[in-house]
C-alpha cells in the first residue's frame, strides 16, 4: 500500500491497494489531508514523532490504525520517508505500508491506549510516556517499532 503527500500532508498519489483498503476513489482522496484515513484511536504522540522525524529528513516506522470510508479499520506497518529533490530539499513524503506483525498488535494497542490516556493531560505527557517506554526497552523509537515487526 503506497501513498505520497506534499509538505502539508495532502495526498498527491495513492496506489490501488491504498484505495481498496481505505474504500475511497482517487478523486475522493486526491489533494485531501492524509488524515482522512486516521482512526480516532491513534495517539497524537505517534504523529508528532512521525512529523518530527520526517522534518529532519529521517525515515520512520510506525504501527498505524487507519479508518476506512465506511468507518471500519485496518492496521498497517508503515515506513514513511521524505521525498528529496535534486537540491536535497524535502518536497513531500512517501509512505509504504505493509501487513503488520499480528503478534505485535496487542502490544501496540495497549501502548496506544496508555498514550491516549496520557494525552488527556496534554501532548507532552504522551511524548514523555513514549520516550520512557522506549528507554525502558533500551531502544530508539524506530528500533522498538521495527523489533515488534520482526518478533516471532
Residue ranges of each PLM-predicted region?
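PAS-family sensory modules
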Residues: 1-6, 96-152
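Sensory/regulatory domains in signal-transduction proteins
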Residues: 1-115
Amino acid at each position: 500500500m503506497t501513498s505520497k503527500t506534499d509538505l502539508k500532508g495532502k495526498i498527491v498519489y495513492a496506489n490501488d491497494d491504498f484505495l481498496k483498503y481505505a474504500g475511497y476513489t482517487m478523486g475522493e482522496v486526491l489533494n485531501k489531508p492524509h488524515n482522512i484515513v486516521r482512526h480516532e484511536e491513534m495517539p497524537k504522540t505517534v504523529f508528532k514523532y512521525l512529523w518530527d522525524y520526517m522534518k529532519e529528513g529521517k525515515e520512520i516506522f510506525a504501527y498505524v490504525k487507519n479508518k476506512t470510508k465506511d468507518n471500519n479499520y485496518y492496521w498497517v506497518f508503515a515506513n514513511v520517508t521524505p521525498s528529496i529533490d535534486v537540491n536535497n530539499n524535502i518536497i513531500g513524503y512517501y509512505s509504504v505500508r505493509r501487513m503488520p506483525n499480528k503478534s505485535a498488535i496487542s502490544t501496540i494497542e495497549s501502548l496506544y491506549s496508555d498514550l491516549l490516556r496520557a494525552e488527556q493531560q496534554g501532548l507532552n505527557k504522551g511524548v514523555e510516556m513514549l520516550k520512557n517506554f522506549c528507554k525502558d526497552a533500551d531502544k530508539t523509537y524506530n528500533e522498538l517499532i521495527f523489533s515488534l515487526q520482526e518478533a516471532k
